[in-house]
Every structure is written in structure tokens, then in C-alpha cells.
A protein has these predicted regions:
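Double-stranded beta-helix
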Residues: 155-176
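Glycine-rich nucleotide phosphate-binding loop and flanking beta-alpha elements
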Residues: 136
């Protein structure tokens, strides 16, 4: 299996005046996302690192097949496409919950079977919402001089949610 390699810029490194932070905290945007995902209300993450991130993939970088943490959905905004590679691949509904993994399906994806893997074209400005906790997904290896830059937005179903310190330590190298 290919190892993951990329850089993550956490929310606390962005100015409150940055376009990404303004979009994230803009009530009409959050209301729009709530309607799409079928939630009556969504709340900003209270974690200092997780609300808004930018994932940076340079030449040779990629993400391995993985699930996101146990959230209702994953939302990403493509900021800049790679010169080559950096393709988003998704194997939908490879599990129905953290405890209910379809091992045959997962094994087929990890062994290279492509019949149930979807390739999602990502152009700058494109917003993608998917069930990252239930769908195995990855980004293929990036090539060329131009980095692939993608924003990730984390909203919660209840107010005041702080992310898992183990996840923060693993992803950002620090807890807060």
C-alpha cells in the first residue's frame, strides 16, 4: 500500500479575515450546506485546528486509501489542481458504520479492482460533499510543479465539539 504524504495547514494559522474563514463562518453558506446534507442546523467546530484546513500535495505526495473520522459528511473545496495526478478516487459505502465494514469490498479496492471505484474530477472552485466516514477514498500521487491545494471544512451537528486529541496529534503534530 502506498504511504500517505502531504502537508496540512490548520485553522489557527489562517486570519479571521481570510476568504476561507469568512466562507466557513458565513451563515448563508452553513445554512446551504445544512439543506444539502439534510440537517436542521450545523455548528462550527470548536476545535482550534480542525474547522478549516488546507491540504497541500506537492510532487510525489498522495493520500492512501482511508476513511475520515466518524462524522456525518466530509466537505472539500478544490483551490488549485495539480499539474498532473492528484486524482480523487472514492469507493462509496464500503462500510455502514465504524463497526460494519464490508471486508470483501474493501479488500477488492485495496487489491486494485476498479469496477466500484469512482473517479471524481476536481476543478478549482468545486465543492464536494461525501460520506468520508463510510466511503474509502484517496488522492493519487501528484506530479508536476503545481501543487494540489484543497480546503476541508468541518461542521458539527451539536455546538461546542472539540476534535479528538489523538487525531490532532497525528494530523497536525500537536493537540492545539
Amino acid at each position: 500500500m502506498n504511504p500517505a504524504r502531504y502537508r496540512m495547514i490548520p485553522a489557527d494559522l489562517f486570519s479571521d479575515r481570510s476568504s476561507l474563514m469568512k466562507l466557513y463562518f458565513w451563515d448563508p453558506f452553513r445554512d446551504f450546506i445544512s439543506q444539502i446534507v439534510g440537517e436542521s442546523e450545523l455548528y462550527p467546530s470548536a476545535d482550534p485546528l480542525q474547522p478549516v484546513n488546507v491540504i497541500c500535495y506537492g510532487p510525489g505526495d498522495q493520500s492512501a486509501w482511508h476513511y475520515d473520522s466518524d462524522n456525518a459528511f466530509t466537505m472539500t473545496l478544490m483551490l488549485q489542481s495539480a499539474e498532473a495526478g492528484g486524482v480523487f478516487e472514492l469507493a462509496p459505502n464500503t462500510r455502514c458504520g465504524i463497526e460494519e465494514e464490508n471486508l470483501e469490498y474493501v479488500s477488492s479496492v485495496l487489491s486494485g479492482e476498479r469496477d466500484r471505484v469512482h473517479t471524481v474530477s476536481r476543478t478549482p472552485g468545486e465543492l464536494t460533499i461525501f460520506r468520508g466516514c463510510n466511503s474509502l477514498h484517496r488522492v493519487t500521487q501528484v506530479a508536476g510543479a503545481r501543487e494540489r491545494l484543497m480546503a476541508v471544512f468541518v461542521y458539527e451537528k451539536t455546538p461546542g465539539v472539540i476534535g479528538d486529541p489523538v487525531v490532532n496529534q497525528t494530523v497536525y503534530g500537536r493537540v492545539n
